[in-house]
């Protein structure tokens, strides 16, 4: 039904069977990729989006993996000339970075009242209480603004580094939405 309804849409060019599977998933996703390659060759297929420690999927037409991303600022000063080529140059298929970024920003405590019911921002309340307990309750807004600026700088650096990398097929960002309560991965 998916391919009949949407198969010719310009935005439907890639398909993965899932995200971060567990168990004995490589044989199953290999069959998934082989099935779809034979059934509908208009698109390219991968088994799943995975972290760096997950196995490589040998039947993929492209890989979505977390390995070639991140900042190197712990071992060197920030710069704007490096790329990730040495982390993808041995991969034969196109490489897409899985969940690029995930740079956290301090929460906006003024939003706590907006989250109710199952979406109640208990984690925000905990962070606010920790600040209050340490006599820094009035600094929440400053922390939010400073961490938000750092978050923007980190995303900019990482995305630009990805775009500078020859043959890098792209990147995925995690949870671009208005609700900032995905656990504490804000």
Where are these regions (language model features)?
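Substrate-binding/catalytic cleft of secreted carbohydrate-active enzymes
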Residues: 1-170, 174-177
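Extended hydrophobic/aromatic segments used for targeting, binding, or gating
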Residues: 180-186
């Amino acid at each position: 039904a998916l391919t009949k309804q949407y198969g010719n849409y310009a935005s439907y060019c890639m398909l993965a069977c899932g995200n971060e599977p567990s168990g004995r998933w490589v044989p199953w996703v290999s069959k998934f990729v082989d099935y779809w390659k034979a059934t509908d060759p208009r698109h390219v297929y991968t088994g799943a989006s995975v972290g760096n420690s997950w196995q490589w999927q040998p039947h993929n037409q492209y890989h979505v993996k977390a390995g070639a991303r991140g900042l190197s600022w712990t071992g060197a000063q920030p710069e704007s000339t490096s790329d990730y080529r040495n982390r993808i140059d041995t991969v034969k298929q196109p490489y897409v970075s899985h969940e690029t970024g995930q740079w956290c920003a301090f929460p906006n405590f003024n939003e706590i009242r907006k989250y109710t019911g199952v979406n109640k921002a208990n984690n925000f309340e905990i962070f606010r209480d920790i600040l209050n307990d340490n006599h820094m309750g009035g600094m929440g807004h400053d922390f939010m603004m400073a961490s938000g600026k750092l978050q923007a700088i980190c995303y900019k650096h990482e995305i630009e580094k990805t775009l500078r990398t020859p043959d890098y097929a792209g990147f995925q960002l995690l949870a671009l939405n208005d609700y900032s309560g995905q656990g504490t991965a804000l």
